Amino acid sequence: MKYMTVGNELEGASQLILGCMRLAEHDPKEVVSVLETALEVGINFFDHSDVYAGGQSEAKFAQALSSAKIPRDRVLIQSKCGLRDVHTNYHFDFSKDYIISSVEGSLKRLQTDYLDVLLLHRPDALVEPEDVAEAFSQLHQAGKVRYFGVSNQNPYQIELLQKSVEQPLIANQLQFGPAHTPMLDAGLNANMLNPLAIVRDGSVLDYCRLHHITIQPWSPFQVDLNQGLFMEHPKYTQLTETLHAFASDYQVSFEALVLAWILRHPAQMQPIVGSMNPQRIRSMVAAFDIELSRADWYKIYKSAGNPLP
């Protein structure tokens, strides 16, 4: 495992994050096994949201920490807020009162006095930056949140928040993986008249690198939010075969090879993996033992149907 500083602020974070969205689907003994395995291989950073399983993922995480007698200071806990009424009238809410009440709820479920990181989940079109700033300052001054960041936001959305928020925004969660590369496509096709040249995210990758914001890639094995795993998608047969071949060459698991491809990018990303399988978690850490050559990295990129200009 390698360790990093998130956003030039939070030191000692594992470069691999365990995503806890599906934690609630497993029984208490399985959850303990997952957490113990993660810590055993060096993962100390855990990602949550107040909406994952209606808050039950946070609660089960806390129960597992207690059962396994894992000290709070051995883990870095990140949670997210801003999504409301997910199963009824789904919408976004970055109001001061809702941010504070969401954090209070997460702290109670997680049985902790503080979050290491709080992220705003998806952009709220009705956001009032001053409201967010007041919420963040109140939470920070009370010692309830150490650091702050965002999720799925473009450069101007971040700029708008940072204009009022006094704390640095240290992370931005964005989907990224071999089958989901809009962060790369536009830059590689600059000045070209093809669909890949369309800038869809405001050049967020370069922006985050310039402003010391750590990108946390989510769902690295998926096509997008609604199309499932790329390994099961007929459009990505060549990509899957290429990755399997390289995994064999480098003598690592398929999952480790995918993560190695992400980690090869010099942006120092911090990928999120959501596996609840201890054996698979162990195998993923081998991603840090290899470094893809430029030729191999680009071959994987092209095998997903991305021609170079």
Where are the language model's segments positioned?
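Beta/alpha (TIM)-barrel catalytic core signal, keyed to glycine-rich beta->alpha loops juxtaposed to Asp/Glu
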Residues: P129-P309
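Acidic-and-aromatic substrate-binding clefts and catalytic sites of carbohydrate-active enzymes
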Residues: L23-K29, S49-A59, D124-E128, S151, ...
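Active-site mouth loops of central-metabolism enzymes
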Residues: G19-K29, H87-D97, L126
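Active-site groove signature of glycoside hydrolases
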Residues: K108-E128
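N-terminal binding-site loop/beta-alpha segment at the start of enzyme catalytic domains
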Residues: M1-V75, Q141, Q222-D224
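Short, acidic/polar
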Residues: H26-A38, F94-R109, Y156-E159
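Structural motif corresponding to the early beta-alpha repeats
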Residues: A68-K96, H121-R122
